[in-house]
Amino acid sequence: MAFAANSAVAAPTPAPTKATATSNAACPVTPGVTPAGITLGWIGSKTGPAATTYLGSSEAAQLRVDQENAKGGINGRKLTLRVYDDASNSTTQISQAQKAIADGVFGLNANASTVSMWPTLKEANIPVTGFSNPAFGTDRNAFGVVGASTSSNPAISSTGLLEKLKSMGATKIALVNHISAGSVSTFNALQNLIQYVPGMSLALRIPDSPQGAHDATSEALRIKNSGADSVAYSGFIDGGISLAQALKQQGVTLKAMNIVGLSDPAILRTSGGALEGALGTTYGALPVGVNVRAMKTYASAMKAAGLNSYSPAAPLGYIGADLLIKGLKVAGKCPTRQSFIDNLRQVTNYDGAGMIPEKVSFMPGLFPNGNPPRCTWYSLAKGTDLIPDAQVTCGARYIDTSTGKVVLS
């Protein structure tokens, strides 16, 4: 995969002034920070089965870093972003996290489904931004760009998706997920939640769908025989496409199908109509086609850099870098990892560069790291276009499925 990391600079990076450099030199020595620069990192899947899901994420992160450098950096310090490929592999992810620490990286932007690195990063007190993984709900050093992750507590789930599918006519749902910590935990909770959504019932659960593109014929036949009229899929986008194509081949007509990460209309042009009517959800950012200035600015900047703004994880790479920048700005003139974590934990109105449906507080809430998101902006596949809803959908209720109690609304 080609890297465009150094091609996204919109303007020459101003050099720190002599006065700024002299002032910064008075700061205590700390990992990743010099008087003239700060070293950050992106870690995730550049290769392996998850690679297509995370296409463009590191490049989008580099774009946000370049934009900040073009404005002079942070307190005169230029930002550098290093990329670490976990190869969609648990062992490799740990070694890459250890390498980032050895390289003196100040903090990381994580875009990955693999979760083996989190104890290592927590122990080293490395600030991390990203999404989905359980650590974003519990680990003090981990900051979820769209809020706390529910996957740290498999008993808690949001009614948002089920209510949306119900509004499309769904009554009997098949839940399909591949094996990753986030997908398994989220869909375990979703399965237990169905009983608390009147008019919805579980037709089938497939908890071990293969990762990535695969022959999904057997899954399609199981869904067909279950009598399901709707499907919710969580996994790598290629796996969702495989399932949709197999369902079409088996003549299965659904009232609703949701694929997490369905955000790129280019996919519709190569799927043979299998995704017609599918409900797309991003990984937490607004859809690129929505009429919001920040999304238009992001899309234009990505296009100018020769990058695909529609890639599912690309907006999260950009926002993850933005959150690292936000944390550095609130960490003080002499930033340390600890001041980054302590001060960013006090922020209650982070707006994700204007690219997320609601502002995020990093103060304790339903989870130690705050509240999970209650708003989602959906899109619908029509022909070769993904049409965003006219407005964001909010008001999701979070239910503790072990008790049936509403814990957040």
Question: Across the structure, where does each feature detected by a protein language model lie?
Answer:
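An alpha-beta-alpha
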Residues: 144-207, 230
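Extracellular/periplasmic periplasmic-binding protein-like sensory domains
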Residues: 148-151, 247-318, 392-395, 404-408
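Secretory targeting and sorting signals
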Residues: 1-12
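Extracellular/periplasmic bilobed ligand-binding domains
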Residues: 124, 187-283
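Segments of small-molecule ligand-sensing domains
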Residues: 304-311, 326-388
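Beta-alpha junction/loop-to-helix N-cap segments that form part of ligand/metal-binding clefts
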Residues: 26-28, 52-59, 71-138, 208-216, ...
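Periplasmic-binding protein-like
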Residues: 100-112, 129-131, 172-177, 227-237, ...
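Extracytoplasmic "Venus flytrap"
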Residues: 22-62, 84-90, 176-186, 287, ...
